[in-house]
Amino acid sequence: MKKYFVVSLVKNGILGGGIVADQEAITYHTGKVTVPREYRQLVMKYDEISDATEGWLFILPTVLVKMKNGKEYKFVVFFSRKRLINTISAHGFHP
């Protein structure tokens, strides 16, 4: 079953979009044409995630997703940050 999260990617500003979580990966997507192509449909497979931690950007709740290849993606999560962490944990990664 897919789960949906309202998020913004923090990369050279705050880029609105959403995350869809399914059985294989979490996928950030946005329809904004000003966002570089590599971030418009960003697939993060659970087995490639090395860490996921909660944090803050000023007053906004965030989740930092670290990949095994060294890349990091910070997301402002507007609702249910804990549910996003739990979704990642349920698929193999445990913070």
Q: Where do the protein language model's features map onto the residues?
A:
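Glycine-rich, low-complexity intrinsically disordered segments
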Residues: 93-94
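Anionic N-terminal interaction surfaces
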Residues: 1-24, 41-42, 83-90
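Phosphoinositide-binding peripheral membrane targeting modules
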Residues: 13-14, 23-66
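Canonical phosphoinositide-binding patch of PH/PH-like domains
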Residues: 67-85
